[in-house]
């Protein structure tokens, strides 16, 4: 097994030197901080989607010192459109721990990393192996696919996750870990793709147990996404929008949204507008299909409302400083 493991890791290493995606922005000027942000952004999100968000984030917060004084609001604002906003809240929580407990020094051992919000076993492994060049296994979606096919591990087996971690640990080399870790992620992303793997170009073809074989298509019972209707009232004057912070622990938590009505006819806290309009559209979340209706009310000037909900009249020129769900931001920007 040792010889097979060595062959596996050296094949990945050599392939990466020739074919790796070295131009990805998080693979330049590598620091633990930069690796951490990229790994969090890449959770459940494609590389091409992450790149512009990562670049924008790094311009605003290029290092731990820069982000140390950031508010949660500032981080959420930069996250608008990337989705899975819990990740942004975890970044805020983690940077606070690093600032207060570790004095702005990024942890460099597994036990400390794994305790930080949003950092699991695989993310900790990526930070250790890429930023610190310490041998540590990873098992993101791409690596899981490579190893499961290479060793013909049935992903439907209840023991598959434990087996995959065991093999990932076995294949992880003690040297040249930096190239290996990025290489196996790249092989999974570029070569051993989900539907059309390019076995002829794969560095692991000679030892892969499923190379050139027909893929096993697992017919998972696709869970029907729940549908939900949302009704909002967006009040705005010539220079400001009235927005409310969503405090419920659900999707869009802590983001700013228009007043959420219980139903289409429940606009009880607003006075008569000088003009009104209604927009209807659909928006898909990973687990939910939303049907959104927004009543847009125009007023001459901001006004006080009677509510215990956290709310604020926000200047149109300051909207970019607040975290908003993408569909809400699109509606607002169309009225700026």
Can you describe what each PLM-predicted range is?
Residues 3-6, 10-198, 204-207:
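Catalytic cores of DNA base-excision repair glycosylases
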Residues 1-22, 28, 189-336:
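Intrinsically disordered, low-complexity, charged terminal extensions of DNA damage-control enzymes
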């Amino acid at each position: 097994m040792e010889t097979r493991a060595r062959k596996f890791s050296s094949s990945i290493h050599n392939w990466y030197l020739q074919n790796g995606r070295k131009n990805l922005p998080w693979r330049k000027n590598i620091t633990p901080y930069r690796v951490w942000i990229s790994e969090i952004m890449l959770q459940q999100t494609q590389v091409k989607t992450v790149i512009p968000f990562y670049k924008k984030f790094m311009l605003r917060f290029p290092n731990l010192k820069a982000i140390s004084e950031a508010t949660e609001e500032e981080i959420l604002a930069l996250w608008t459109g990337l989705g899975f906003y819990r990740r942004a809240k975890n970044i805020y929580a983690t940077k606070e721990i690093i600032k207060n407990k570790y004095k702005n020094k990024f942890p460099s051992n597994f036990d400390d990393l794994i305790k930080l919000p949003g950092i699991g076993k695989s993310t900790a492994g990526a930070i250790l192996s890429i930023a610190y060049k310490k041998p540590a296994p990873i098992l993101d979606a791409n690596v899981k696919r490579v190893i499961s096919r290479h060793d013909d591990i049935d992903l439907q087996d209840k023991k598959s996750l434990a087996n995959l971690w065991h093999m990932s640990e076995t294949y992880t080399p003690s040297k040249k870990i930096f190239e290996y870790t990025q290489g196996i992620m790249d092989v999974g992303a570029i070569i051993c793709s989900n539907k059309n793997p390019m076995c002829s170009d794969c560095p692991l073809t000679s030892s892969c147990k499923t190379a050139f074989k027909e893929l096993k298509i697992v017919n998972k019972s696709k869970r029907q996404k729940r549908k939900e209707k949302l009704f909002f009232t967006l009040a705005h004057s010539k220079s400001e929008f009235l927005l409310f912070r969503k405090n419920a622990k659900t999707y869009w938590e802590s983001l700013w949204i228009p007043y959420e009505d219980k139903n289409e006819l429940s606009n009880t806290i607003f006075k008569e507008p000088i003009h009104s309009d209604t927009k209807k559209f659909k928006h898909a979340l990973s687990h939910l299909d939303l049907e959104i209706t927004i009543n847009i009310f125009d007023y001459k000037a901001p006004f006080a409302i009677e509510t215990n909900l956290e709310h604020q009249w926000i200047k149109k020129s300051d909207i970019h400083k607040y975290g908003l769900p993408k569909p809400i931001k699109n509606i607002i920007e169309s009225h700026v």
